[in-house]
């Protein structure tokens, strides 16, 4: 793109795409600059991104109004894990075909992606749980046309909160059991 800069001092094997994008060093692929906020592998969500990991910005210096998450186990318990098979794009509702394939050329996708049992959630159901619990998070994203997407990695946060809540309950029960055992309580008989 215009103004792309691949000149990261002496860097090799780099790809830089987009207006004002700058190289980062050896073996980097950079797509866009700080203005790029979305990257689609395929508009219909059928694309697959292969990576060994992803890293998201989480630096305290770029955050404000930090508070403890108020929900955990109660939130997780309302979610419905499901298994499903993906539909072939030709079987999408017409409004989605119009959105993803405006030229009318609906692509056929290989069976290797559509014959595999998938596991996950229904984004509309998760959004309903968010509304019910007044949970402001960006786990569910809805685009301007009403297409729902989920950021599954963000579910880790309420899951960790749920684990913390369960751990606190277990510790309290363990203390109660220890107290009962130390008092040598006998039920239904004499010492």
Report each predicted region and the residues it spans.
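Glycine- and small/polar-enriched repetitive beta-structure motifs of secreted/surface proteins
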Residues: 1-53
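Glycine-rich, low-complexity segments
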Residues: 7, 37-68, 72-75, 172-191
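Acidic, glycine-rich loop-and-strand cores that form catalytic or ligand-binding grooves
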Residues: 72-112
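Stable alpha-helical elements in mature extracytoplasmic
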Residues: 72-75, 122, 159
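C-terminal intramolecular chaperone/auto-processing assembly modules
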Residues: 102-110, 132, 136-191
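Residues that recognize and position ribonucleotide moieties
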Residues: 119-120, 148
């Amino acid at each position: 793109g215009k103004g792309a800069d691949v000149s990261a001092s002496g860097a090799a094997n780099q790809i830089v795409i987009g207006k004002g994008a700058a190289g980062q060093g050896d073996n980097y692929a950079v797509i866009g600059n700080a203005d790029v906020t979305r990257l689609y592998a395929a508009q219909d969500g059928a694309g697959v991104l292969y990576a060994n990991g992803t890293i998201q910005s989480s630096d305290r210096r770029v955050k404000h109004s930090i508070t403890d998450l108020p929900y955990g186990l109660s939130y997780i318990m309302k979610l419905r894990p499901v298994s499903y098979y993906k539909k072939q794009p030709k079987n999408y509702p017409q409004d989605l075909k119009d959105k993803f394939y405006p030229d009318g050329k609906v692509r056929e996708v290989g069976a290797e992606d559509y014959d595999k049992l998938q596991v996950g959630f229904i984004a509309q159901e998760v959004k309903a749980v968010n509304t019910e619990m007044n949970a402001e998070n960006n786990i569910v994203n809805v685009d301007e046309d009403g297409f729902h997407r989920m950021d599954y990695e963000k579910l880790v946060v309420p899951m960790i909160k749920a684990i913390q809540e369960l751990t606190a309950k277990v510790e309290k029960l363990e203390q109660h059991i220890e107290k009962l055992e130390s008092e040598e309580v006998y039920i239904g008989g004499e010492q």
